[in-house]
């Protein structure tokens, strides 16, 4: 997206930034040479160019997009709401997260009986509080610049969620990470209250105070947001849904969460597989049970949909005795 000097000034005045088609709000000023030098001194290799490109756009801020991470077959909704920066009011600021990683690296070296040179191989740059973190590999070699995702495991009582700390390689570089950001629901639809993009949309609304130039820029930014909406309906209408993994998963999830048996039938006829994993390791049956869509759950069982080991626990708050007994028998 090409921006005029006047538009860049408006973005700066409203603490907004655009990076690889995504809008950052509460955006911080570009990184200084002094900060780059201080960061580089503690790393095992050079700061990857894509991360520098992001930081030269904004050295921190907030994001309002959906991101899914596949942890060895467990589909996890990853909270990527923060781009860490110095002196932020988050759980830790950037320096705090770097010090946290240094402490962990030193402890690991001591436990393994080896020396550590004090240089980080992986630099934390974003995530959400203490629950999710994104790192970029700074160690020289074929993985230099790759983005790594880490998520904190939750107690077993959180049925269907990650129960152990998990890590995976997510993207080749920071630009690749930003290309994964999307909206699973239309953020402009008033029925999608409390959505992931609510604060982002409020930040765009503030542009209207700048008069016609601000309204025009807001419109351009909204176009960028609309390009990230994952709408499965056109693909269902034109017959291409089965060939679009992310769209068909969202379609199945919405049908299951709404308990829409007619739509489930249409999706099956369109080539969607009821055995496909949608969230965690669960599929359409677990999505129905989690929302208490018991009629749809019974229908799925009638179609031969397999029961997972945690299906009963996922639906425990909604199940009646007959359906619980049926699940136990399968």
Regions found by a protein language model. Give the residues of each.
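Ankyrin-repeat C-terminal turn/loop position
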Residues: 272, 305-306
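Ankyrin-repeat-protein effector appendages
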Residues: 318-330
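Intrinsically disordered, low-complexity regulatory segments in ankyrin-centric signaling systems
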Residues: 200-265
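Ankyrin-repeat boundary/"N-cap" motif
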Residues: 242-254, 276-287, 308-317
């Amino acid at each position: 997206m090409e921006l005029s000097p006047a538009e860049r000034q408006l973005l700066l005045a409203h603490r907004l930034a655009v990076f690889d088609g995504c809008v950052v709000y509460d955006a911080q000023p570009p990184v200084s040479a002094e900060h780059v030098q201080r960061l580089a001194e503690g790393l095992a290799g050079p700061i990857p160019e894509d991360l520098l490109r992001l930081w030269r756009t904004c050295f921190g801020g907030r994001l309002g997009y959906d991101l899914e991470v596949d942890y060895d077959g467990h589909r996890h909704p990853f909270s990527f709401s923060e781009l860490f920066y110095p002196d932020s009011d988050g759980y830790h600021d950037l320096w705090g997260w770097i010090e946290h990683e240094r402490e962990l690296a030193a402890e690991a070296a001591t436990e393994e009986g080896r020396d550590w040179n004090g240089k980080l191989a992986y630099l934390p740059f974003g995530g959400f509080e203490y629950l999710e973190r994104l790192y970029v590999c700074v160690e020289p070699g074929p993985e230099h610049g790759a983005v790594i995702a880490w998520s904190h495991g939750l107690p077993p009582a959180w049925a269907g969620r990650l129960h152990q700390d998990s890590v995976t390689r997510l993207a080749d570089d920071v630009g690749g990470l930003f290309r994964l950001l999307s909206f699973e629901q239309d953020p402009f639809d008033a029925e999608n209250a409390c959505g992931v993009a609510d604060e982002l949309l409020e930040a765009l609304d503030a542009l209207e105070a700048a008069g016609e130039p601000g309204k025009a820029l807001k419109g351009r930014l909204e176009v960028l947001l609309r390009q990230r909406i994952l709408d499965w309906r056109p693909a269902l209408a034109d017959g291409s849904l089965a060939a679009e993994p992310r769209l068909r998963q969202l379609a199945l999830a919405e049908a299951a969460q709404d308990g829409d048996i007619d739509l489930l039938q249409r999706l099956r006829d369109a080539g969607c597989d009821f055995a496909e994993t949608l969230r965690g390791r669960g599929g359409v049956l677990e999505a129905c049970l989690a929302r208490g869509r018991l009629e749809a759950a019974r229908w799925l069982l009638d179609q031969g949909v397999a029961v997972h080991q945690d299906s009963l626990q996922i639906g425990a708050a909604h199940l009646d005795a007959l359906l619980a007994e049926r699940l136990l028998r399968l």
